[in-house]
């Protein structure tokens, strides 16, 4: 009876008019009733079992809180939520989940042993992940009940959540249905349904999801132990690791954003799924703030700016690759020139390496084993024929499978190893802007942020262990200098040895200590991500923040102990013995294309002068001044500045000035009869600040100075 009451109370007026699958069904389908009935039966047994354990083992446990405070609790009885209420009512209201001994934990799940306890709120990345994961369960419940959906997967993402579900071979969800589905989700949150965590055996899981082939596949593929967890919430029962919110009422504001299709791939033919994406917050006020932020972000979308300013475009005949138009190429080249100038005085040597390599190289480096699916491999013509015995090594056809390089490091190792090296050559800093190719899935492509073909400001430093700390400090200084010019703040994180690391633990300890010391001396705040390093070495991740406060991981500093071993890299030390160098992977911009997109959004298309594809427009007052205007334009171009001419006689002077401001030209040189006679220009900025009359050569020289110093506010300090 409880199920039928829940089903009825969740039905909304108007659903039948929207023609949603089960809107006219007054009772739940048989499979749902059976699934929920089995869940309730297993839940009752679990509650009884836990109560029995708490009675049999009534023991006190010690709970350690951040800051050193310790609290007594009762094993199998006390929950993190109860402790939060003891500490503060505000904490109890704002906590979304807990961390117990570093692992995510439900607030209503009893503690079992002595533990370190930390509470997660929505303000933390971990808290947001829990909050949005719970929200996708709400979306799944709504889709299941009112669309007749067969649920597939519903993760949280960096900026919200989505749920994939199956509606049949022909059925898709229409955009017009999203508002109704959103309203259903809001009703489910208002009902404040609790999330209940259940441990079930593999056989029980198969019974619970016997009518859902997607969940059955996940059970066989992902569940490796004797049990796994499912969560119940209202009429929803879903396979899930958790944790979740205490109840759906903690979701104060929820909005569905988009619908699209996705693919489910298993051993059979791919199934087309429907994907609905959304966002949620603890309060409606936070949702309103986010909506205003999103409106601003859409105005700053780099794809929109790229189209309006004619910087770049994409074409279906080259998916995942960008076509940079002349103005976009100007910005691109200015960024690369900036890094090249830094390389020149920081002791880096730029090199060029091939794009195609035999897969033997990638097997030697280890990338073929771990990265093969993300690489483009090609079979050269005639590769099925053995090379002629008459040909020598220089003309023999290579019969190996070839692959486009997704990174430069193995090529730089070949470059280091191609001749004997001495300690006097170290540190050897090799920089490479070569094109990289990665086989990104078509669904993951998006503007400049994820491409199949791109360039990086990629460099590798080969040094001795004694030089390591100084090189790391130099890399950090490089980052700070570049990001300061670009106007980005940033946050550093040290990722240390993971469980599956390779190499000598003592070497890892030594390297991690060097990185910690370098970060300490660098003076910027940093976080420690224990166990989050790559298997081949610890790393420093760099998260920059744009004008909208969004984080972007672009730069990196990565130590590598494995490639020098795999390529047997050696140099002759001061004592004459052969020694192994340390390898540092480092990038500041990361993908140049991606960083250009981040910059476009951060400045909203108002480029700083040194990067701007719209530096100066010369505007003659009348046709009589057009020749002098062309002369002024030529002077600007001869000085290496981007200059355009607007002599459109069909528009008034004020209309042309306004057009230049809307196009975000940094400066406008207006020339009339007086300016022509005196060989001067009248200067305005894009914000309509009037700088007055300047001699043409002096104005050009001042712009060159401002461009060369890469100031962010040339219009203000002209």
From Swiss-Prot:
Major location (coarse): mitochondrion
PANTHER family attached to this UniProt entry: THREONINE--TRNA LIGASE, MITOCHONDRIAL, THREONINE-TRNA LIGASE
Enzyme class of the recorded protein, top EC level: ligase
Residues modified to Phosphoserine: 52
GO MF terms, alphabetically ordered: aminoacyl-tRNA deacylase activity; ATP binding; protein homodimerization activity; threonine-tRNA ligase activity
Subunit note: Homodimer.
Keyword Phosphoprotein belongs to the record: yes
Stated family: Belongs to the class-II aminoacyl-tRNA synthetase family.
One of the record's GO cellular component terms: mitochondrion
Organism classification: Eukaryota, Metazoa, Chordata, Craniata, Vertebrata
Protein name: Threonine--tRNA ligase, mitochondrial
E.C. numbers: 6.1.1.3
């Amino acid at each position: 009876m409880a199920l039928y009451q829940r089903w009825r109370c969740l039905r909304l007026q108007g659903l039948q008019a929207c023609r949603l699958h089960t809107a006219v069904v007054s009772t739940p389908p048989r499979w749902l009733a059976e699934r929920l009935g089995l869940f309730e039966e297993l839940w009752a047994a679990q509650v009884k079992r836990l109560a029995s354990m708490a009675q049999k083992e009534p023991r006190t446990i010690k709970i350690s809180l951040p800051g050193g405070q310790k609290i007594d609790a009762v094993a199998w009885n006390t929950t993190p939520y109860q402790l939060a209420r003891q500490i503060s009512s505000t904490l109890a209201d704002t906590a979304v989940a807990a961390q117990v001994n570093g692992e995510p934990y439900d607030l209503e799940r009893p503690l079992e042993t002595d533990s370190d306890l930390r509470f997660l709120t929505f303000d933390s990345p971990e808290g947001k992940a829990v909050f949005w994961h719970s929200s996708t369960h709400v979306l799944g419940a709504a889709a299941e009940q009112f669309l007749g959906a067969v649920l597939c997967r519903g993760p949280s993402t960096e900026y919200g959540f989505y749920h994939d579900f199956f509606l049949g071979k022909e059925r898709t969800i229409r955009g017009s249905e999203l508002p109704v589905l959103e309203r259903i989700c809001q009703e489910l949150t208002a009902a404040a349904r609790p999330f209940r965590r259940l441990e079930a055996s593999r056989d029980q899981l198969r019974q619970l999801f016997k009518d859902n082939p997607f969940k059955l596949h996940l059970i066989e593929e992902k569940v490796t132990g004797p049990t796994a967890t499912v969560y119940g919430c209202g009429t929803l029962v879903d396979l899930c690791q958790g944790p979740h919110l205490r109840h759906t009422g903690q979701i104060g504001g929820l909005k569905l954003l988009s619908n699209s299709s996705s693919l489910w791939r298993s051993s059979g033919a791919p199934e087309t799924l429907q994907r609905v994406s959304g966002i949620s917050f603890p309060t409606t006020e936070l949702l309103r703030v986010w909506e205003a932020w999103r409106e601003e972000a859409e105005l700053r979308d780099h794809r929109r700016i790229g189209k309006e300013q004619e910087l770049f475009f994409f074409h279906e005949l080259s998916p995942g690759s960008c076509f940079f138009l002349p103005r976009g190429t100007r910005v691109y080249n200015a960024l690369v020139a900036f890094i090249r100038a830094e390389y020149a005085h920081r002791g880096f040597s730029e090199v060029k390496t091939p794009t195609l390599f035999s897969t033997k190289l990638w097997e030697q480096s280890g990338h073929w084993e771990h990265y093969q699916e993300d690489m483009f491999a090609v079979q050269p013509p005639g590769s099925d024929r053995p090379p002629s015995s008459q040909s020598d090594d220089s003309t023999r056809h290579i019969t190996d499978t070839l692959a486009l390089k997704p990174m430069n490091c193995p090529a730089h190792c070949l470059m280091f190893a191609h001749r004997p090296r001495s300690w006097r050559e170290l540190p050897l800093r090799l920089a490479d802007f070569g094109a990289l190719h990665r086989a990104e899935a078509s669904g993951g492509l998006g503007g400049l942020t994820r491409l199949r073909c791109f360039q990086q400001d990629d460099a590798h430093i080969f040094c001795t262990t004694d030089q390591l700390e100084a090189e790391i400090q130099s890399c950090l200084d490089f980052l700070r200098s570049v990001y300061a010019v670009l106007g980005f703040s940033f946050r550093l994180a040290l990722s240390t040895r993971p469980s599956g690391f390779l190499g000598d633990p003592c070497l890892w300890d030594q390297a991690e200590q060097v990185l910690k010391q370098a970060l300490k001396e660098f003076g910027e705040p940093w976080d420690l991500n224990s166990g989050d390093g790559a298997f081949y070495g610890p790393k420093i991740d760099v998260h920059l923040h744009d004008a909208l406060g969004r984080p972007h991981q672009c730069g990196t500093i990565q130590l590598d102990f494995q490639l020098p071993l795999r390529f047997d890299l050696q140099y002759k030390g001061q004592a004459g013995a052969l020694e192994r160098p340390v390898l540092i992977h480092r990038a500041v911009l990361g993908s140049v294309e991606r960083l250009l997109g981040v910059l476009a959004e951060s400045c909203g298309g108002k480029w700083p002068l040194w990067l701007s594809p719209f530096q100066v427009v010369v505007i003659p007052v009348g046709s009589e001044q057009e020749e002098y205007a062309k002369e002024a334009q030529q002077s600007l171009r001869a000085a290496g500045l981007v200059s355009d001419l607007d002599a459109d006689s069909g528009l008034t002077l004020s209309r042309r000035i306004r057009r230049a401001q809307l196009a975000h030209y940094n400066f406008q040189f207006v020339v009339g009869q007086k300016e022509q006679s005196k060989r001067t220009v009248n200067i305005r900025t894009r914000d309509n600040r009037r700088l007055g009359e300047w001699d043409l050569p002096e104005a050009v020289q001042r712009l060159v100075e401002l461009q060369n110093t890469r100031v962010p506010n040339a219009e203000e300090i002209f």
